[in-house]
């Protein structure tokens, strides 16, 4: 059908829609699809709110996937039903009640009690939504509605403007402050449970009721990109907090069917996908860095805790956003892929998220390295459906490989929706999806002072946590992580086939003053201080490939009474530990370096090939911990025959001793502890770690590493594969020889020279205190008779300058 009209004729949008036409050239109109016109004529489509509610329910609960014949689903259903039944039974319903559940009585003066109460109602709603439940009765519906009404009048909805004033005044108090009032509960904790409940029981409430219940959110959390509004100190949210607050506002707008709020929420969420700037200070330091580091609370490496929360939040949000008219940020996928590849994957080994990235979460009994890794895998599986085909296949292989790498725990126990369980079952039974082989990977996170190394051939992973002016040695707030003193002060981690070593009560029963890799003071009295950073800036590392790295830490303890230069060299199948300049300003306390602090777990310990359990201050060339499984074996060759002390002893502890909110049940483990004492005349150490070797093979390794230089400010080692690795801690020029050819290191920095052929060395150099530019590398390092070629600078803060020395 074709129409011709005169130029003066006017056609309204409605006329066009009724006629089903659209303007073409020369004033001619042609018949087209009416819906296309509606889209073209309207700036933004109206969101399909029903579809969005269903998407949220599918991602987070998956009721339509429930199969009572699936044992994991039935287990979850029974647990959810039982908990909800008990909560309904225990709920206070009498008139004049002051609270709804015992244990959460002080709703107005303890905000966590308010959040816990709303969370209890959410748990009931979760059970009632399941079609197979026996709880979806008129009586229970009335109970839930009455409970929400009561809470609105007596807690979250009670004079919110007045409450903000009270919270703001309390927040600025220096004395007499109520520390039980937390902004998080008003802006994230409570509204998260409230909005979930209203979506779960959407058909039980009128639109007016739902809007009434969500109205306080606008007072406590008016903006989708800000936190601390409830305490009068609104600031831009970052990282996990930004995901959480934008998620709350997105759910609020779905409930209220508010398109403008939806756009703002999604715009706020999109701000998550940015990198922290190099010049950032204070809270601006929170978030992901280009080298994959994730910092929270300004100076704490937190990929394995807040980073995991962020990733899970993204996995909840992205499927929703893709169903809205505002899904136009395809670059988010690229950024997210980088975070997963560089940020998360190097920190996961055999279904375990390395504790060096979990901050104070290590002090929570039920929040383990396995549960953190399981959450990452669950998130990857969700995200795979929202990614391109190649990324989808990649993530599914990663998840399958991780789940099958450790049988000591059940991944499905950590899945909290039927759709997650269904996805996992489909993945694990899909023979077309293969597993990945073991990974050879070396990752240096210079922006959070962490290193991880995965050795493919020997099937082990090594981790290192350090401290500097930018990175705290540990975090202890809210009564958590009370003994984390040295966890970020040079502690080394060895992950092998003993998959339960760290997550099975290690942080409760280990001697926290004797952590492997650390140098501490004997009889040290440790105090909790606000600033847990070092004042040192020379901390970091460089790698030349995925097998060789040089790492250094200019070290001082918390009290600044102990200093040392501590170097760590990763050389393929071995890790070299070198220390010098170990000095205590307190003559009453001698320094001690802990070489090993390992659960005995079926190990037999040998010193110089002689079985022992205790040896006090004896000269030794080697220590070997032998297991019935060669992959679990751990060997140490000493480079200067030091006096070593070995102990085998039983340690007991309680989770409550490291986290006030945890249980006080006593736990017991046996440990082997290997230490070296220092003095003014014995102020250095040098040893080599060899994981996963038989005792006979270990013996053949005794001369593989040579100490070239072990001076106060200059460390260089050589291995028999023609690799030289070193650290220059001073600004002075230092020299060493390679086959009678002089190498000059003219500036501070970590460096590696790896022989490529008779005429060429592959090299890398990094100085954490300066800009690492390829243009002036000649002023940093040189080798007589060799010229520098093939210079390039890493695009991230990981590797420094790569170059070749060519004859």
From Swiss-Prot:
<dbReference type="GO" id="GO:0030246">
    <property type="term" value="F:carbohydrate binding"/>
</dbReference>
<keyword id="KW-0732">Signal</keyword>
<dbReference type="InterPro" id="IPR011071">
    <property type="entry name" value="Lyase_8-like_C"/>
</dbReference>
<dbReference type="GO" id="GO:0030340">
    <property type="term" value="F:hyaluronate lyase activity"/>
</dbReference>
<dbReference type="GO" id="GO:0005975">
    <property type="term" value="P:carbohydrate metabolic process"/>
</dbReference>
<protein>
    <recommendedName>
        <fullName>Hyaluronate lyase</fullName>
        <ecNumber>4.2.2.1</ecNumber>
    </recommendedName>
</protein>
<dbReference type="Pfam" id="PF02884">
    <property type="entry name" value="Lyase_8_C"/>
</dbReference>
<dbReference type="InterPro" id="IPR004103">
    <property type="entry name" value="Lyase_8_C"/>
</dbReference>
<dbReference type="InterPro" id="IPR038970">
    <property type="entry name" value="Lyase_8"/>
</dbReference>
<feature type="signal peptide">
    <location>
        <begin position="1"/>
        <end position="40"/>
    </location>
</feature>
<dbReference type="InterPro" id="IPR008929">
    <property type="entry name" value="Chondroitin_lyas"/>
</dbReference>
<dbReference type="InterPro" id="IPR011013">
    <property type="entry name" value="Gal_mutarotase_sf_dom"/>
</dbReference>
<dbReference type="Pfam" id="PF02278">
    <property type="entry name" value="Lyase_8"/>
</dbReference>
<dbReference type="InterPro" id="IPR014718">
    <property type="entry name" value="GH-type_carb-bd"/>
</dbReference>
<dbReference type="Pfam" id="PF08124">
    <property type="entry name" value="Lyase_8_N"/>
</dbReference>
<keyword id="KW-0964">Secreted</keyword>
<dbReference type="GO" id="GO:0005576">
    <property type="term" value="C:extracellular region"/>
</dbReference>
<dbReference type="InterPro" id="IPR003159">
    <property type="entry name" value="Lyase_8_central_dom"/>
</dbReference>
<feature type="active site">
    <location>
        <position position="297"/>
    </location>
</feature>
<feature type="active site">
    <location>
        <position position="241"/>
    </location>
</feature>
<keyword id="KW-0456">Lyase</keyword>
<feature type="active site">
    <location>
        <position position="306"/>
    </location>
</feature>
<comment type="similarity">
    <text>Belongs to the polysaccharide lyase 8 family.</text>
</comment>
<dbReference type="InterPro" id="IPR012970">
    <property type="entry name" value="Lyase_8_alpha_N"/>
</dbReference>
């Amino acid at each position: 059908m074709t129409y011709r009209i005169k130029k003066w004729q006017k056609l309204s949008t409605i006329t066009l829609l009724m006629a089903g036409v659209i303007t073409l050239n020369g004033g001619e109109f042609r018949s087209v699809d009416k819906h296309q016109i509606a889209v073209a004529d309207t700036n933004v489509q109206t969101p399909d709110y029903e579809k969005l509610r269903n998407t949220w329910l599918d991602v987070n609960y998956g009721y339509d996937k429930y199969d009572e014949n699936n044992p994991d689903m039935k287990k979850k259903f029974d647990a959810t039903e039982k908990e909800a039944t008990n909560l309904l039974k225990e709920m206070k319903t009498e008139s004049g009640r002051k609270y709804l559940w015992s244990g959460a009585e002080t709703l107005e003066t303890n905000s966590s009690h308010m959040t816990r109460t709303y969370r209890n109602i959410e748990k009931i709603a979760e059970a009632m939504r399941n079609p197979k439940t026996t709880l979806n009765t008129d009586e229970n519906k009335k109970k839930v509605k009455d409970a929400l009404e009561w809470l609105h009048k007596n807690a979250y909805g009670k004079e919110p403007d007045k409450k903000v004033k009270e919270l703001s005044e309390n927040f600025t108090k220096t004395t007499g402050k109520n520390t039980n009032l937390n902004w998080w509960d008003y802006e994230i904790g409570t509204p998260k449970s409230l909005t979930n409940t209203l979506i779960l029981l959407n058909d039980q409430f009128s639109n007016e009721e739902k809007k009434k219940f969500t109205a306080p959110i606008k007072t406590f959390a008016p903006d989708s990109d800000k936190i601390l509004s409830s305490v009068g100190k609104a600031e831009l949210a970052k990282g996990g907090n930004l995901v959480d607050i934008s998620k709350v506002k997105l759910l609020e707008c779905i409930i209220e069917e508010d398109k403008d709020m939806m756009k703002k929420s999604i715009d706020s969420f999109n701000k998550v996908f940015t990198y922290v700037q190099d010049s950032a200070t204070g809270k601006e330091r929170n978030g992901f860095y280009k080298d994959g580091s994730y910092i929270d609370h300004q100076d704490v490496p937190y990929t394995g805790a807040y980073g995991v929360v962020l990733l899970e939040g993204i996995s909840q949000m992205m499927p929703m956003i893709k169903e809205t008219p505002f899904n136009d940020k395809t670059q988010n996928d690229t950024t997210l892929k980088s975070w997963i590849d560089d940020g998360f994957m190097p920190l996961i080994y055999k279904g375990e998220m390395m504790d060096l990235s979990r901050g104070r979460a290590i002090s929570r009994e039920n929040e383990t390295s396995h549960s953190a890794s399981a959450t990452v895998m669950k998130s990857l599986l969700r995200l795979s459906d929202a990614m391109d085909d190649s990324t989808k296949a990649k993530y599914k292989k990663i998840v399958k490989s991780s789940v099958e790498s450790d049988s000591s725990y059940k991944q499905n126990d950590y899945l909290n929706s039927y759709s997650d369980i269904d996805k996992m079952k489909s993945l694990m039974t899909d023979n077309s999806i293969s597993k990945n082989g073991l990974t050879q990977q070396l990752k240096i996170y210079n922006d959070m002072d962490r290193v991880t190394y995965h050795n493919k051939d020997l099937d082990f992973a090594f981790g290192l946590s350090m401290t500097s002016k930018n990175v705290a040695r540990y975090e202890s707030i809210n009564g958590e992580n009370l003994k984390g003193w040295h966890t970020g002060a040079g502690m080394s981690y060895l992950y092998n086939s003993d998959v339960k070593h760290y997550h099975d009560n290690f942080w409760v029963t280990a001697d926290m003053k004797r952590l492997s890799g650390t140098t501490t003071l004997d009889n040290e009295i440790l105090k909790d201080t606000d600033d847990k950073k070092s004042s040192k800036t020379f901390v970091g590392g460089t790698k030349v490939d995925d097998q060789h790295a040089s790492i250094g830490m200019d070290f001082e303890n918390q009290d600044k009474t102990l200093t040392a230069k501590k170097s760590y060299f990763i050389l393929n199948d071995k890790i070299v530990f070198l220390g010098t300049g170990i000095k205590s300003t307190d003559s009453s306390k001698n320094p001690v370096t802990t070489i090993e602090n390992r659960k005995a777990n079926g190990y037999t310990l040998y010193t110089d090939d002689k079985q022992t359990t205790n040896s006090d201050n004896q000269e030794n060339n080697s220590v070997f911990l032998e297991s019935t499984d060669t992959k679990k074996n751990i060997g140490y060759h000493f480079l200067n025959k030091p006096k070593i002390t070995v102990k085998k002893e039983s340690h007991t502890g309680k989770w409550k001793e490291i986290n006030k909110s945890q249980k006080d049940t006593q736990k017991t483990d046996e440990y082997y502890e290997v230490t070296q004492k220092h003095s003014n005349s014995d102020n250095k150490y040098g040893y080599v770690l060899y994981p996963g070797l038989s005792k006979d093979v270990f013996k053949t390794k005794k001369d593989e590493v040579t100490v070239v230089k072990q001076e106060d400010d200059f460390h260089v080692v050589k291995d028999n594969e023609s690799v030289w690795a070193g650290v220059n801690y001073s600004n002075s020029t230092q020299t060493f020889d390679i086959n009678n050819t002089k190498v000059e290191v003219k500036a501070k920095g970590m460096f590696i020279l790896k022989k490529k052929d008779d005429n060429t060395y592959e090299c890398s150099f990094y100085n954490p205190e300066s800009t690492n530019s390829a243009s002036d590398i000649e002023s940093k390092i040189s080798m007589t008779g060799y010229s520098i070629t093939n210079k390039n600078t890493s695009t991230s803060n990981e590797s420094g300058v790569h170059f070749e020395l060519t004859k």
